[in-house]
Amino acid sequence: MLEQLQTLKSEAETQINEAADLKTLNDLRVKYLGKKGPMTEIMKQMGKLSAEERPKMGSLANEVRTALTEAISSKQEILETAAINEKLKSETIDVTLPGTAPSIGTKHLLTQVIEEMEDMFIGMGYEIAEGPEVELDYYNFEALNLPKDHPARDMQDSFYITENTLLRTQTSPVQARTMEKHDFSKGPIKVICPGKVYRRDNDDATHSHQFTQIEGLVVGENITFADLKGTLTVLAKTMFGEEREIRLRPSFFPFTEPSVEMDISCFKCGGKGCRVCKGTGWIEILGSGMVHPNVLEMSGIDSTRYSGFAFGLGPERVAMLKYAVDDIRHLYTNDLRFTKQFQSTETGEI
């Protein structure tokens, strides 16, 4: 039986290798491995062997069957590939093959950063408020404690459309509109205001005539500076790491009093001083402060009863710092070599 198995294996492998088409190969499968084939006959004869020979010959027979099965599968794959190639040569289009999948975009880096901040604030009970990008001069300046003759207006050149309308230079007008219509019987104001803003800046590595801002506003009874500091601490740790510390420096903004700028401990050097933090150990992130009483009163809010805080930051700056982007223009030029480095996995691949 040993010689019979060896002869069968050699003969079958030779014929399998020489098979020129799938029909011939299938005939060989039936011939050698079918119910009436030699392998089946050999397996039936196992019962006639002695108890000592049966395990050895049974194992050998199984090895031969496995070898022939694998040889047939391998040859089948070769013949199928050859058949497809031959068919492709004779047809302009093979409609049975899968088509080329379209490229699917992912969320832009800025969108990812904005949504990360939105998710954080929504988790803290904030709502998202929006307003027009073509804004009235009143809401962009006067309602924010910047009357027409205020010297602080020179701090930001604006794109005026008419004498009283312009492209908003900040998302703060959304805060003014929100305060005007808010009903405090339904609770305090807790909103963030993301959106595009426009300023007459010359485009360079750190400036753009159009960019995005996210501003936050909380107004209610007994809102204190401690509430502002706690909120900014959560923001810094969420966006830049739990180990971040914050530093608040006195500053000036017409719509807040007192006003502060927030720095975070450098995430690159841990506060030791490096190129990113310019050797100081700290990186400036945003401006903030307690809402000026004049701003509250202009919105019809009793400043003796209600207080609040506001803050504002640029997602571009957050993205540039967090992901080591050295030129703001990379965020807007739509160069796939750049954007592919920050692919989101939510919607597929670029």
Swiss-Prot record:
One of its GO terms (cellular component) is cytoplasm. Mg(2+) binds at residue 257. GO terms for biological process: phenylalanyl-tRNA aminoacylation. Pfam families: Phe_tRNA-synt_N (PF02912), tRNA-synt_2d (PF01409). Binds 2 magnesium ions per tetramer. It catalyses: tRNA(Phe) + L-phenylalanine + ATP = L-phenylalanyl-tRNA(Phe) + AMP + diphosphate + H(+). Its main location: cytoplasm. It is an enzyme of class 6 (ligase). Gene3D superfamilies: Bira Bifunctional Protein, Domain 2 (3.30.930.10). This is Phenylalanine--tRNA ligase alpha subunit. It comes from Listeria innocua serovar 6a (strain ATCC BAA-680 / CLIP 11262). The gene is pheS.
